[in-house]
Amino acid sequence: MINTKRGQVGKPRVTVKAEFAATQPIKLPEYIGAADYMQLLDDVLIDTGQRPIYTDKIAKTRANYDPDLYPDVDWVDAVSKDHASNQRVTVDISGGTEILRYSFVAAVYNERGILERDKKREWDPSIKLQRYNVRSNVDLKLSPTTQLRFNIGGYLQDRNSTTQSVSEIFNRAFRSVPFQFPAQYSTGQIAGTEESNVWAMATQMGYQRTSASKIETLFSLEQDLKFITPGLKVKGVFSFDRYSTGTVKRSTKPDIYNAASGRTEEGELMLTKKENGSNTLGHESTGTYGTKSLYMEATLSYDHTFAEKHAVSGMLLFNRRHFDKGEKLPYRTQGMAGRASYTYSGKYIGEFNFGYNGSENFAKGKRYGFFPSGAIGWIVSEESFMQPFRRTISKLKLRASYGQTGNATLNGRRFAYLSTINDSWDDLKQYNWGTESGYNRNGMAEGEFAVPNLTWEVVNKANVGLELGLFNGMVDLQFDLFDERRHNIFMPRESIPITAGFIKQPWDNYGKMKNQGAEVTLNINKQFNKNLFVSLMGTLTYAHNEITEKDEPAAVVGTKRAETGYPTGQNRGYIAERLFTNDDFADVAAGTLKEGIPAQTFTAKLRPGDIKYVDVNQDGKID
């Protein structure tokens, strides 16, 4: 759905805006140099009664004697620039008449990333992004009661990058040794391996270009039916979106040498080639992908106030969605929704909502789910007894709601009400025979088992809240308590043992979970003068979730491996807090801890320097 600003009545207005930005990491780890690194290694050898091995290298590295043989490489600096940059130019044209209003926006965006490149190479593996955006909105009044709107937008984007993972490049740069070999020898050779020489990994392995395009369209027609009754409207919406992307990968690799062992009498580096590279760039098309989405919606709405006190509104909506991403079958959903609300004298509010949603993921007769909800509210600040406090308490509202929502996205599995039959290559070894089992044949095997009674996952949600405004809106406070209970969670029936003969674990609507908590939001807005406005906003949230029912193996139930009764994603295992110090011990020699420090039952004798673990369940021991 496209929802952007609309054109306004008036002469054409043209706005051009140019922006430039430079970005850089706020903080990077500081690494010791090669000489200090080797000195620490020598110190470890000395402390363990061994002879140091880097004494000569340390002296020559500090003296910058021969950077080829005694390098000192900051690998993060070698693969990255000081900053990245981006530029954007936007042109906005809008205007219109009482009958036709329009808005047109076009933008060009360029970005250059932080990765370095080898300027001696004709090709560039550094990160670059170029995007062209266009969006137009038109409002056409076909009659005094008929409004046609259409929005069309899209973009073209080209992204250039290295063929390697950027995160992996930096991960390796962070932990690479600074003294083994330089990023590149002064004579041009590259030492190490494709993985250990991070500079080569970032700059010598080729490049890839990804092109993407997207078009979004939305058409709506709204008819005011006030000639039937005031406040009645009907609206139809049609949307069509399309997205496509593809990547061309041009891979290569350089000749790789072992680290130089010295220099000849003529002063040349003594290098031996370890691996031959490639003199050409490969060509591979990857990542070709596209999606298509169709959306239709019809809405009947009503909004009217009777006798200045009785505000009544309602809405009925039907929608259908079709989403195709090139799989065997597209995704389809459809449903209805409704809302009815009543407000008396601007103070007492009641609302009822429902959703009647359908999903292809369920069998016939079970595809639709009905999910109602209701809410009530009381605007206390509108009461007559609150008027003397109006300047201080500008708003006080109490509200409560309860309702249901449904989920048909069942762990990404489609049509789980049907059994599947798979090629045995996927689930079982094929049948082998002959000399050294050299002959084989695939067969068919049972895949996923059907869940004929599969139904919607349901969430019951309850909420009570307070909204408080002070000093004519200068302070706005919201407080909410919420409680969510989820049931019919689709999960594997892990209590069924393997000996039952299932190739894959059966699934079912079995699980239950609860989520409870509170949220506080505070906004402070102050206009000091016409040139100074200050706004502060803060949010504090506390939430606790717990698995209340989960089908688990019999060997797990009742043990510390059980997930029932714990938050989802609960960490398992020990959590390191810090290292023990002398101050933690009542008797260092005996390994006796001071009172109040949890004992670690799995260690025969503790010493300063051992890892101190967190007592997660507060039982006074780590076991």
Task: Enumerate the language-model features and the residues they cover.
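Extracellular/periplasmic, surface-exposed regions of secreted and cell-surface proteins
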Residues: 83, 137-146, 152-156, 161-167, ...
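Hydrophobic transmembrane signal anchors and adjacent membrane-proximal interface regions, especially
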Residues: 56, 121, 127, 232, ...
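Membrane-proximal, glycine/serine-rich, low-complexity loop/turn segments characteristic
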Residues: 1-212, 220-226, 410-428, 554-559, ...
